[in-house]
Amino acid sequence: MKPPPTCAIMREMIETNLAGKLKEGLPAELIGCLEAAAKLAAERGLRLYLVGGVVRDLLLERPNLDLDLVVEGDAVALAQGLAGTAAKITTHPRFQTAKLDWAGFSVDFTTARSESYDRPGALPTVKPGSLESDLFRRDFTVNAMAVSLDADRYGELIDHYGGRSDLERRLLRVLHQRSFIDDATRIWRGLRYEQRLDFQIEEDTLNWLKRDIPMLDTVSGDRLRYELECVFREAQPEKVLCRADELGVLKKMHPALAADGWLRDRFRLARRLSLPDSPSFGLYLALLAYRLSGQECDGLIAGLKLSRPVAQVVRDTAALRANIKTLSYPEIRPSYVYRLLHGLSLAAVTAATIAAASPVARQHLEGYRHKLRYVKPTLNGDDLISMGVPPGPRVREFLERLRDARLNGQVASRRGEEALLREWLGEAV
């Protein structure tokens, strides 16, 4: 059973003006942006609203500094007017949107609009509309609320579709039964919100979600990859992935993917190893793909249209997994470990360190991550040539042999390297 809403939420369910919440929940720089935007909108006879997730999170008393402003009028022109003195701007005229970089914060401006979809999975066709139509195009009722920024209604909460009531009941509800057909990526968004906010997906919404899972086949690889990136930015992405696996959603990324207790434990360990940072997209993806075959990894790479560096992480992970048995032998020399792992992406090595079942293999992988990969001879190519090594491929060969000697503990100083090189040169005569 879900816990009852906090007193703070109950209070806000009764209060319909959030002016105080705005002041308490946003930094002064963003309040300044809202005030400047509202003033300019009033001068131009436009109505301006704060919408979406930030309104939801104000009611939940959760931090959210991503501001979305909707203008009943020309949002791009309004943003350009603000950008003239205090901000940088990026515009997208096709979608009637603009993004301001205001005092280091990102603020999105959108013309109130309605949307239609030519086919499932397509990007929407947009046309100017009312605030009500703009809110109706949102994914869930809890994200379909607005706060007026007009001087005569400042802070007034606008809730046409029952978002406050669903917040109170901790429910995620779509606005109409074709929502997932129009945009199947809302399935992934719903799972993220469900786990992040500890909400439940409303019964009809869950039935429609299950019904429309095949619609994910209409979504491009680029958009699916973006949804996975968003999952990995969650505090506990494994919860989202396990829920997606439970519902059959994860298989639409690739039929061989699985999210279970094994993955949950590895993701948690990845976060501990990555402190104070968060794990990279590549590391999380490498762990998710760790149990896939090489051929299955190729399918995942193609399906998600992964960039070349990230694709290499996935391929390196598959290659490493194939070598885990070799790395499980305690007697292999450090130089051999180096040769097996050198040139592979660090994210793949880290993933194998986390995922490998063999303690010996993990020890070899840890040794490479923390020590072996940094080892190199003191002597350089010029030193070798001055000592009699002929220019050409022999220089590289001797440098590699010196590195191996360092790795295996045969030498520990420049003088030792020089002595060993003279010995090798004497043998070559």
Regions found by a protein language model. Give the residues of each.
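Catalytic cores of the polymerase beta-like nucleotidyltransferase superfamily
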Residues: 2-429
